[in-house]
Swiss-Prot record:
Residues 993-1006 have a biased composition (Polar residues). This is Extracellular calcium-sensing receptor. The modification Phosphoserine is found at residues 892, 899, 920, 1061. The modification Phosphothreonine is found at residue 888. The extracellular regions of the homodimer interact in a side-by-side fashion while facing opposite directions. Each extracellular region consists of three domains, LB1 (ligand-binding 1), LB2 and CR (cysteine-rich). The two lobe-shaped domains LB1 and LB2 form a venus flytrap module. In the inactive configuration, the venus flytrap modules of both protomers are in the open conformation associated with the resting state (open-open) and the interdomain cleft is empty. In addition, each protomer contains three anions, which reinforce the inactive conformation, and one calcium ion. It comes from Homo sapiens (Human). Glycans are attached at residues 90, 130, 261, 287, 386, 400, 446, 468, 488, 541, 594. Changing residue 825 to A: Does not affect G-protein-coupled receptor activity.
């Protein structure tokens, strides 16, 4: 009695608890029973349970043709195994398959049925009854589909270690073996799928997406893993929403508004088709287009979403699909289904009715109930499922499945169906291992084997964990330690078929889980059709891409993906799009105009090839040529008076120094090297000091001689050539010492200056010591200042005495140039520093060359008549007479004042300003050299009393004159000189006698004081000039003239053979001087 009571309790638990009727299952007896859980319907009808009566099981609605095909795949695999002699011979597999209706509650009802039929040791029911012979055990379960459903089922089956092999549940939570002890699956883990989604977004350079997930154990873990992967790739999520097929309208409206207001174009969805369908319907109703949907494998090929009327919203969807498999003979098996023939499949009747939209009457042989009315059914908006009640015609039973397009018959890509097929074969191979196990080699204690006829579920689970077999496609099948079967994904794109207008899934790439990171994803972009039938990759970024040359700048308060593009600063670059930072260019490089790369900095110096450098070089060469030309002219005409009058040896040295000055400017042109930097400043400084020293010595020599009170041979000897060269050497040696100290202590060197301008490297000379450079230039300016002082002081001396006036001008030019050089040098940089110094050198050099030598070259080449000894004598005598005239006038003024003080008449005082004018007549023949000077000075009365002889008259008529007119304000002094050939006769002896008598007299006339200097400028004759003053009070006397010692350096004396007349008029008095030489 107890035995029967126990059996009835278990049967009640099995049948009444599950509340499944005969037409809500597919079952077949066998030696070993396999359980199956499939979503034959998408959901259940909402029904209020007020508990006023016994609660009934909820009704399943919205038929799932794919779910029925998956069920058919399990039946096909079992029948194929039963008919195979190689696998489980002499054993028959049976099945019990239930509809989960895609809900946890229905799945648990079916699971309780599986559990109740097993021997439950934990309940200790064996003491009361043994029903195992009457109710066969379910040793494994295939299913379920959704991860949420499988999670609930796994929790229950895991309590009894009943193996569960899922074909579509990919949640990564199910890999936890501590919680789900008996769960295995033939589908990859969602962890790889989430990574693949992030890789696709990174591939298309999207960084601004939205996420939607099903509010279950599939959607939440999947989207969480995606967030982790997105964060690693700097992908920002604009919004994240949870949905469910049971969400109320308000929740759906909220999610739709979020999508509509979002700027993200790409939406990642981890959900199943039934959970996503209400949201898609509302989006279609609002006509929200332009979004790119990234679908997980749970809905990537869902018939609920992939409907033509939704294509304008979901067209272009990129989704993941499991790798398609091949099931030989499965196509024909699907076509054989018929409600009257498929006696073991209780779902065939409803399938037939939903396929042909008709109503089947129960036949005599069929198990179908007899209904006297036409059934209505809720359908899901299409011909197979709608929300309205419609009356259906009777089915004839002769309908052809091939004539109707349904997802059931779409076997082109067998993905989930193949996973079901593989799950059944996995269990079969585990049973085969038990069947073929040899004692001692088993997996159990002491190598024992399980008895195939009394096999238990936990034993099958043990063998499934160690399963390893080759499937019909030649692939190795094995479960890892987490019970997962690692596999690859196909990437599909939703297209609209041009033939029938249905949505087709085009394979556009794949994702290889086994490949290395970065090589897992392959996409053929040419095959992708985006939303709106566009071939262009859509833009889904919070900010536009920052092009090369810019970097991403953070916007405060915004996600990291929302940024502004900031141009790279000068000296930095970015050569990639969306660079997070700019790279700094190397030291000798600078960023280009677009900051996309680094280019070598421009090297800048005063080059030989640039126009400015060429111009300066030409001027320097011109200066060298002109200086060489002047030197050549001076050498060629070295014996002419004008060359001799300029102290030709010093002139040669001066011209050589000018050549050095012009040449030194060339060291400042070209790329600076260490040796040129060390050479150019000393070369410039020494050359200019040598030049100025020559001018200084020449000018000072003349000044000292003219200022001497009693010029004697001491002055001539002191200012000899040797001493002059010695002074030039000493002045130059000081500059050499400065340069040597400079080069020894802090030598200049070439320097690459990158601080002045960012884009240019200025190759300049680092002077080493600015103090040394200051000493060099300061010493040069000091000598120039002294030279200018002496030249200015001697500016009124005779022109032929080194042209002091022109030297003054040259020194003025020199100072103007170098004073202008200082601010210009200080305010310029780079190559212009060298250019300024070159210009200063050339300007100063040209000034010295032009002022000192060009006038002489002009006279030598174009006015040879002035390049005579007579012209030199005239100039010298003119200066002497001007000095004498001043002295005479001063004495006249003194006598007048003295007479006025004694009561005499007074006259006006002449002005102190004096001007002179000289006129030279025909050139004189050059006199022969005289060894003895024979001047003669006669008084005015003697000149009038002594008659002239005929030769003297002729000579007086022919001899040339040099006239001078001196103006003293209100007074005028006019004098004239004439020169004649010296005669070695009695007349010369008589003149000598008169000269001796005149030398005995004491005279203070200034003319006599300058007389010894006359030979310094005269070429080859001696000069004898005596002026006797009459009509003036006071004694008349003169100093004795020293002898000429050096005939080459000192010119011979002149013989004055005509009268010298001075007319001095001042106020009411006139002073006349006549000097007659014959």
């Amino acid at each position: 009695m107890a035995f029967y009571s126990c059996c009835w309790v278990l049967l009640a638990l099995t049948w009444h608890t599950s509340a499944y009727g005969p037409d809500q299952r597919a079952q077949k007896k066998g030696d070993i029973i396999l359980g199956g859980l499939f979503p034959i319907h998408f959901g259940v009808a909402a029904k209020d349970q007020d508990l006023k009566s016994r609660p009934e099981s909820v009704e399943c609605i919205r038929y799932n043709f794919r779910g029925f095909r998956w069920l058919q795949a399990m039946i096909f695999a079992i029948e194929e195994i039963n008919s195979s002699p190689a696998l489980l011979p002499n054993l028959t597999l049976g099945y019990r398959i239930f509809d989960t209706c895609n809900t946890v509650s229905k799945a648990l009802e079916a699971t309780l049925s599986f559990v109740a039929q097993n021997k439950i040791d934990s309940l200790n029911l064996d003491e009361f009854c043994n029903c195992s012979e009457h109710i066969p055990s379910t040793i494994a379960v295939v299913g379920a589909t959704g991860s949420g459903v499988s999670t609930a089922v796994a929790n229950l089956l895991g309590l009894f270690y009943i193996p569960q092999v899922s074909y579509a549940s990919s949640s990564r939570l199910l890999s936890n073996k501590n919680q789900f002890k008996s769960f295995l699956r033939t589908i990859p883990n969602d962890e790889h799928q989430a990574t693949a989604m992030a890789d696709i977004i990174e591939y298309f350079r999207w960084n601004w997406v939205g996420t939607i997930a099903a509010d279950d154990d599939y959607g939440r873990p999947g989207i969480e893993k995606f967030r982790e992967e997105a964060e690693e790739r700097d992908i920002c999520i604009d919004f994240s929403e949870l949905i469910s097929q049971y969400s109320d309208e308000e929740e759906i409206q909220h999610v739709v508004e979020v999508i509509q207001n979002s700027t993200a174009k790409v939406i990642v969805v981890f959900s199943s088709g039934p959970d996503l369908e209400p949201l898609i319907k509302e989006i279609v109703r609002r006509n929200i287009t332009g979004k790119i949907w990234l679908a997980s494998e749970a809905w990537a090929s869902s018939s609920l979403i992939a409907m033509p009327q939704y294509f304008h919203v979901v067209g272009g969807t990129i989704g993941f699909a499991l790798k398609a498999g091949q099931i030989p003979g499965f196509r024909e098996f699907l076509k054989k289904v018929h409600p009257r023939k498929s006696v073991h499949n209780g779902f065939a009747k409803e399938f037939w009715e939903e396929t042909f939209n008709c109503h089947l009457q129960e036949g005599a042989k069929g198990p179908l109930p007899v209904d006297t009315f036409l059934r209505g059914h809720e359908e899901s908006g299409d011909r197979f499922s709608n929300s309205s009640t419609a009356f259906r015609p009777l089915c004839t039973g002769d309908e052809n499945i091939s004539s109707v397009e349904t997802p059931y018959i779409d076997y082109t890509h067998l993905r989930i169906s193949y996973n079901v097929y593989l799950a059944v074969y996995s269990i079969a191979h585990a049973l085969q291992d038990i069947y073929t196990c040899l004692p001692g080699r088993g997996l159990f204690t002491n190598g024992s084997c399980a008895d195939i006829k009394k096999v238990e579920a936990w034993q099958v689970l043990k063998h499934l964990r160690h399963l390893n077999f080759t499937n019909n496609m030649g692939e190795q099948v094995t479960f890892d330690e987490c019970g997962d079967l690692v596999g690859n994904y196909s990437i599909i794109n939703w297209h609209l078929s041009p033939e029938d207008g249905s949505i087709v899934f085009k394979e556009v790439g794949y994702y290889n889980v086994y490949a290395k990171k970065g090589e897992r994803l392959f996409i053929n972009e040419e095959k992708i059709l985006w939303s709106g039938f566009s071939r262009e990759v859509p833009f889904s970024n919070c900010s536009r891409d920052c092009l090369a040359g810019t970097r991403k700048g953070i916007i405060e308060g915004e996600p990291t993906c929302c940024f502004e593009c900031v141009e790279c600063p000068d000296g930095e670059y970015s050569d990639e799009t969306d660079a997070s930072a700019c790279n700094k260019c190397p030291d000798d490089f600078w960023s280009n105009e677009n900051h996309t790369s680094c280019i070598a900095k421009e090297i800048e110096f005063l080059s030989w090839t640039e126009p400015f450098g060429i111009a300066l070089t030409l001027f320097a060469v011109l200066g060298i040529f002109l200086t060489a030309f002047v030197l050549g002219v001076f050498i060629k005409f070295r014996n002419t008076p004008i060359v001799k009058a300029t102290n030709r040896e010093l002139s040669y040295l001066l011209l050589f120094s000018l050549l050095c000055c012009f040449s030194s400017s060339l060291f400042f042109i070209g790329e600076p090297q260490d040796w040129t930097c060390r050479l150019r400043q000393p070369a410039f400084g020494i050359s200019f000091v040598l030049c100025i020293s020559c001018i200084l010595v020449k000018t000072n020599r003349v000044l000292l001689v003219f200022e001497a009170k009693i010029p004697t041979s001491f002055h001539r000897k002191w200012w000899g050539l040797n001493l002059q060269f010695l002074l030039v050497f000493l002045c130059t040696f000081m500059q050499i010492v400065i340069c040597v100290i400079w080069l020894y202590t802090a030598p200049p060197s070439s320097y690459r200056n990158q601080e002045l301008e960012d884009e240019i490297i200025f190759i300049t000379c680092h002077e080493g010591s600015l103090m040394a450079l200051g000493f060099l230039i300061g010493y040069t300016c000091l000598l120039a200042a002294i030279c200018f002082f002496f030249a200015f002081k001697s500016r009124k001396l005779p022109e032929n005495f080194n042209e002091a006036k022109f030297i003054t001008f040259s020194m003025l030019i020199f100072f103007i140039v170098w004073i202008s050089f200082i601010p210009a040098y200080a305010s310029t940089y780079g190559k212009f520093v060298s250019a300024v110094e070159v210009i200063a050198i050339l300007a100063a050099s040209f000034g010295l060359l032009a002022c000192i030598f060009f006038n002489k070259i002009y006279i030598i080449l174009f006015k040879p008549s002035r390049n005579t000894i007579e012209e030199v004598r005239c100039s010298t005598a003119a200066h002497a007479f001007k000095v004498a005239a001043r002295a005479t006038l001063r004495r006249s003024n003194v006598s007048r004042k003295r007479s006025s003080s004694l009561g005499g008449s007074t006259g006006s005082t002449p002005s102190s300003s004096i001007s002179s004018k000289s006129n030279s007549e025909d050139p004189f023949p050059q006199p022969e050299r005289q060894k003895q000077q024979q001047p003669l000075a006669l008084t005015q009365q003697e000149q009038q009393q002594q008659p002239l002889t005929l030769p003297q008259q002729q000579r007086s008529q022919q001899q040339p004159r040099c006239k001078q007119k001196v103006i003293f304000g209100s007074g005028t002094v006019t004098f004239s000189l004439s020169f004649d050939e010296p005669q070695k006769n009695a007349m010369a002896h008589r003149n000598s006698t008169h000269q001796n008598s005149l030398e005995a007299q004491k005279s203070s006339d200034t003319l006599t004081r300058h007389e010894p200097l006359l030979p310094l400028q005269c070429g080859e004759t001696d000069l004898d000039l005596t002026v006797q003053e009459t009509g003036l009070q006071g004694p008349v006397g003169g100093d004795q003239r020293p002898e000429v010692e050096d005939p080459e350096e000192l010119s011979p004396a002149l013989v004055v053979s005509s009268s010298q007349s001075f007319v001095i008029s001042g106020g009411g008095s006139t002073v006349t001087e006549n000097v007659v030489n014959s």
